[in-house]
Regions:
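TRNA-binding/sensing appendages of the translation machinery
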Residues: 1-83, 138
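Positively charged, Gly/Ser-enriched RNA/tRNA-binding surfaces
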Residues: 17-35, 46-47, 82-153, 200-325
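Beta-rich nucleic-acid/ligand-interaction surfaces
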Residues: 42-60, 161-171, 265-273
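Residue-level detector of family-conserved "landmark" positions at structurally sensitive sites
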Residues: 42-43, 158-161, 180, 259-262
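Acidic, His- and aromatic-enriched active-site or binding-groove loops in soluble protein domains
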Residues: 62-70, 175-199, 203-204
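Cap/lid and interdomain-hinge subdomains that line or gate substrate/regulatory clefts
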Residues: 132, 136, 159, 189-190, ...
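Extended alpha-helical scaffolds
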Residues: 151-155, 163-166, 176-179
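Short, solvent-exposed helix-helix connector turns and helix-capping sites enriched
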Residues: 162, 191-192, 220
Length: 325
């Protein structure tokens, strides 16, 4: 093997692409700053236990690990910047009110994943801490959509979800709260209606019917919300989740060409606590932006704070904008 061949899913970035990426980074960071989001720059490497807290637990298999020759402790190369920004908010800034932060930098993953399907991802994003209201979710979603508009990414398709609906059903049916019965959880994610019906056959009729309904509750936002209110139990948790989705849909109308809701989208269930959103654009199979609510992410750092935010992949955006230049 030639010594200069790069590892799989790791690439050099050549001048034309590098210039597009840098222009995008500057435009987006200026856009964030103008809306009150302050820039932070976490380190590339941290103690592993710090990286794998909150959302970080789901990233353990994605994290490159090494031994620190100075301390002998296990270190990790960041696979996502969200846990690091949460640490900064909770442990270093310690602000009592709402905190708005943004970031941009490389993350490294053991397996190709994320929005660009590379192992090194040029991540940029924004986080809002200290506000548990729907208004905060609306602000972050609005910032994501306006950011894409600022870099001339058009023809957007928005998918909304909310883990609170499944969590309310699992609690009501007395299924384990850590993801529920794993077979049922997986069947819901794959929308396997016959298997969901089989696995819930012994539940009380109201809960059984609700789980079965969940496999069909995806599609245009207005249709899904109407069907969900008709077919799901009228509990405060479910009503609140649907109201949140309704408000987010109102925020996005006019900024996207298509607006869908999927109530069986359980991506990130183990750390998400509320609404999630994924943005797609015409001609791109993968999402170009993702966001979610993850309250309590700073608990491991001494302060459990409401949090919501989103991330984008600069290299993916550069590829999209490069098509039109």
């Amino acid at each position: 093997m030639r010594k200069w061949v790069l590892p799989e899913y790791i690439d050099d970035i050549l001048p034309a692409e590098a210039e597009r990426i840098e222009a995008l980074r500057r435009t987006l960071l200026d856009h964030f700053r103008d809306r009150g989001y302050r820039l932070v720059q976490p380190p590339l490497v941290e103690h592993l236990d710090s990286l794998l807290t909150g959302t970080g637990h789901d990233l353990e298999l994605q994290t490159f690990k090494l031994i620190d020759p100075l301390s002998g402790r296990l270190l990790g190369v960041r696979a996502d910047m969200t846990p690091q920004v949460a640490r900064i908010d909770a442990h270093l800034l310690k602000e009592s009110g709402v905190t708005r932060l943004c970031y941009a930098g490389s993350v490294l993953r053991t397996v190709a994943s994320g929005l660009s399907q590379m192992r090194e991802v040029l991540q940029i994003g924004a986080e809002l801490y200290g506000d548990a209201s729907v208004a905060a979710d609306q602000e972050v979603l609005g910032l994501l959509l306006s950011s894409l508009n600022a870099v001339a990414v058009r023809r957007l398709h928005l998918d909304l979800g909310h883990v609170g609906v499944y969590r309310a059903l699992a609690n009501g049916a007395h299924i384990s709260g850590d993801g529920g019965d794993s077979e049922l959880f997986d069947a819901l994610r794959s929308k396997d209606l016959p298997l969901v019906a089989e696995l819930t056959a012994r539940l009380p009729a109201a809960w059984r019917d609700a789980f079965v309904a969940l496999t069909t509750l995806y599609g245009p936002a207005a249709d899904v919300l109407a069907a969900a209110r008709a077919r799901l139990p009228d509990t405060p948790s479910i009503a609140g989740a649907l109201a949140t989705l309704d408000k987010l849909a109102q925020t996005a109308r006019g900024a996207v060409e298509a607006l869908h809701i999927d109530l069986a989208d359980l991506r990130g269930y183990h750390y998400q606590t509320g609404a999630s959103f994924s943005v797609f654009t015409a001609g791109e199979a993968n999402a170009i932006g993702r966001g979610e609510r993850y309250d309590g992410i700073g608990k491991a750092f001494g302060r459990a704070r409401p949090a919501t935010g989103f991330t984008l992949d600069l290299r993916q955006l550069a590829g999209l904008t490069g098509r039109t230049t």
